[in-house]
A protein has these predicted regions:
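Gram-negative outer-membrane beta-barrel transporters
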Residues: 335, 439-443, 553-564, 569, ...
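Outer-membrane beta-barrel proteins
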Residues: 161-167, 189-216, 249-272, 313-329, ...
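Outer-membrane beta-barrel translocator/receptor signature
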Residues: 118-120, 131-209, 215-221, 269, ...
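Structural signature of Gram-negative outer-membrane beta-barrels, strongest in the C-terminal barrel
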Residues: 214-216, 338-340, 345-350, 365, ...
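Acidic/polar loop-and-plug regions of large Gram-negative outer-membrane beta-barrel proteins
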Residues: 191, 195, 210-278, 284, ...
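Membrane-embedded beta-barrel scaffold of Gram-negative outer-membrane proteins
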Residues: 276-278, 284-290, 294-300, 494, ...
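Acidic, small-polar-rich N-terminal luminal/periplasmic segments of exported/outer-membrane proteins
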Residues: 21-153, 542
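Conserved C-terminal beta-signal and adjacent last beta-strands/turns
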Residues: 6-8, 19, 317, 321, ...
Length: 719
């Protein structure tokens, strides 16, 4: 049925366009807006045989976006996952990911909430495609294009804002001329985080100096260093009711954690350098080197089970990751009479050290305990929250040992659950041709060869009589080498210069060490078998794109995706949740740009059907229908008003017979006041109707409560 609807819409739209105008010309667009910078080489959106969304720095400010999840809410075909309250997590066309993030085309896969202060634009590519990015990206990816120093320009700006939750932020951006061939730019931000939930708070600091050096007319060097220091409360949400299969609204104000026990920190140092050299009129060489060092910790309590008679079964852990990566990428781009040829090489060397401690409750000598849900819960004293109505294992204790008034304490340093050291070495070679077959026909043809060698050393853990785990030597290091070839084909027909019809086929893969490289075998295993071969995804897409003379851009796409190689796997970390044999099909419609001089629109709609060919039940975290609308009316030169709406259909949290996230509609509003050319005041009212909604959940009893109504006032000054 979806195929029929899509093809009908495509035929009707195309016919109407031809009837309206047969000789339209492409209007010029602002810098970056009409190109996808994550692609090599950058190409106009019209000539990309793939669905994508581009959000510029101005879009981010207008809509008051503060993090990646805000952008996703207004992006069709993509929805957010909870990320356990400490990381960006996105579901790209049914595939959950915590690692498919890039900065200037370079992998950025550590788990954290990314800031937007130094972003020129964000590019969201949908559909698995390993050709240009390698492993991962099985459902899509997000690339942030950074602000860089600009030669020959001097400018500076200040952006600051506060909101009714009590949060605030300041960002500064300054570019200066060092001499005729050198420029320096500095971006800095400080955020104080707050929201509608008790105890939530946080701070983010980011500093990003960049330098551009024009060595000669044909050679440019860009240098960048970024420091990030983040800390925030971790909120895992509320439980669901087994009878109603829905979140318990009466608990929407209860936080199952405390500031001391639920927290995450991140410290990162990222150094990047790139060289661009035009060695001829038709040849260009790009070399980039990135070295980074991340220190990430998160610890949290969460509800692992709940019934009204029992109470809330609390569980938790503390997880520490230390990761260092060196990424070297080299590409050579040559233009010919009939197209462009890109040859690229990439080398990645990553060292990852991780350990995880379970929570340890003194009363149960285990990692779980039962408490009665109340506001301002306390997990370290006998405060009436501890209950003897237990149905779980009590670590050798009897019910008589556990009384209503018993004292308990919890710690994160007594019970070691796992520890591993991982080394990943990736060598990649790719080739892509953008070929003009005829005046109206273009083809993209290419492939990528990846060799991924993963060595993991799992440490032995022994549990003593008190239920505490400790190191007990090391298991033998296990090495898995995967060699894969990933093809890509795109065929584009352009009936006129500002219009394209396309077909594309691509593949992507995910090694079985997972996104975060912690393990690819069960703890008891000492060898690696073919069972742990990479998961492979196939993606096909049929689409239509049209840039109208008025400034509007229309895109229609019908897509299918299939997980062709997969085996059941659970690494026990709570981070890797895989759908086995996932099959999706759906369509997407977007309409963006200027309606006329005074009105602009950003509309997107996606419908996705998802099934599992292996196992039973519906695929989780995949709402069948999502749509968003952002409409801006420029009433006068000084005043503009915008209205936004987002809708997300109901979706299964885990399995078809389990709890559901209910559908919801959220309304937003913004007013922009421009008293002068260099001053802008914005007032954003988020969740205008104060809707109670639940955007995502990590598991059955960890449902996030959407933000209540919030008013944000921001001010931008250009100097």
């Amino acid at each position: 049925m979806k195929k029929i609807v899509f093809l009908f819409a495509l035929v009707v739209t195309t016919s109407a366009i031809y009837a309206q105008d047969e000789t339209l010309e492409v209007k010029g667009k602002v810098l970056y807006k009409d190109q996808v910078n994550s692609l090599k080489p950058p190409v106009p959106i019209l000539n990309v045989p793939q669905s994508l969304s581009v959000i510029t720095d101005e879009d981010i400010k207008l809509q008051g976006f503060r993090q990646i999840g805000d952008l996703i809410r207004y992006t069709p075909g993509v929805n957010t996952s909870q990320g356990e309250g400490h990381r960006d997590a996105v579901v790209f066309r049914g595939v959950r990911s915590t690692a498919d993030f890039y900065q200037d085309g370079v992998r950025d896969d550590v788990q954290y909430y990314r800031s937007l202060y130094n972003v020129e634009q964000v590019e969201i590519l949908k559909g698995g495609d390993a050709l240009l990015f390698g492993r991962g990206g099985t459902g899509g990816l997000i690339n942030r294009v950074s602000k860089t120093a600009q030669i020959g320009e001097t400018f500076s700006s200040l952006d600051t804002g506060i909101d009714s939750f009590g949060g605030g932020d300041v960002a500064m951006d300054g570019n200066m001329i060092v001499n005729d061939n050198v420029a320096f730019r500095l971006n800095v931000h400080v955020d104080s985080l707050a929201n509608h939930r008790d105890m939530f708070s946080g701070d983010r600091v980011g500093v990003n100096p960049t330098m551009k050096i024009q060595v000669d007319p044909a050679t440019t060097i860009d240098l960048s260093y970024e420091y990030a220091d983040h800390e925030r409360f971790v909120d895992r949400g509320i439980p669901t009711d087994d009878a109603t299969k829905s979140p318990i609204e009466a608990m929407k104000d209860i936080v199952f954690g405390t500031k001391d026990l639920n927290t995450t920190t991140l410290e990162a140092n990222i150094l990047k350098g790139s060289l661009n050299h035009n060695y001829s009129d038709t040849g260009k060489l790009n070399l980039s080197v990135t070295a980074n060092d991340f220190r990430k910790m998160y610890q949290n309590l969460y509800v692992s089970d709940y019934t009204a008679s029992m109470g809330a079964k609390m569980d938790g852990y503390r997880d520490v990751t230390m990761r260092e990566s060196l990424i070297i990428a080299l590409s050579n781009i040559n233009e010919f009479d009939r197209g462009t040829l890109t040859v690229g090489f990439e080398m990645v060397d990553t060292e990852n050290n991780n350990h995880r401690y379970n929570t340890y409750f003194s009363s149960t000598r285990d990692d779980n305990e039962i408490f009665m849900p109340v506001r301002n819960m306390n997990f370290n004293v006998a405060n009436g929250n501890l209950t003897n109505r237990r149905t779980l294992e009590t670590g050798g204790l009897t019910d008589a040992d556990v009384t209503q008034d018993q004292v308990t304490y919890v710690d994160y340093i007594s019970d070691l659950n796992n520890q591993s050291d991982t080394d990943i070495e990736v060598t990649s070679l790719y080739l892509q041709g953008n070929i003009d077959l005829a005046d109206q026909w273009k083809m993209i043809l290419g492939g990528r060869y990846d060799e991924v060698e993963t060595t993991i050393k799992q440490y032995g853990i022994t549990v003593d009589g008190t239920g505490k785990g400790a190191l007990n030597g090391t298991n033998p290091s296990l090495t898995k080498k995967d060699s894969l070839f990933s093809p890509r084909l795109g065929l584009i027909f352009k009936p006129q210069e500002n219009m394209s019809l396309y077909f594309s086929y691509s593949e992507a893969f995910q090694p079985r060490s997972g996104e975060q490289y912690k393990t690819f075998v069960d703890k008891a295993k000492t060898t690696v078998s073919s069972k742990y071969n990479p998961d492979v995804f196939e993606n096909t897409e049929l689409g239509f794109k049209y840039d109208m003379d008025s400034g509007l851009s229309l895109a229609l796409a019908y897509f299918t995706g299939e997980q062709t190689k997969a085996t059941a796997f659970d690494n026990g970390t709570g981070e890797e949740t895989r759908e086995i044999g996932l099959e999706i099909d759906g369509f997407e419609i977007t309409l963006n740009g200027q309606v006329n001089d005074n009105n602009a629109i950003r509309f997107g709609l996606a419908s996705v059907d998802a099934t599992k060919s292996k196992g039973s039940g519906a695929a989780k975290e995949i709402p069948e229908l999502t749509y968003s609308l952002w409409y801006t009316h420029q009433a006068t030169d000084m005043f503009a008003i915008s209205f936004g709406a987002t809708y997300q259909d109901e979706s299964y949290i885990n399995a078809e017979s389990g709890p559901l996230l209910p559908d919801y509609t959220r309304l937003d509003m913004a007013m922009t006041i421009t008293p002068s050319e260099n001053d802008v005041v914005r007032i954003n009212i988020e969740n205008l109707g104060d809707e109670t909604y639940y955007p995502h959940s990590h598991s059955d009893h960890q449902v996030s409560v959407g933000e209540s109504q919030n008013v944000r006032v921001s001010y931008s000054k250009r100097f």
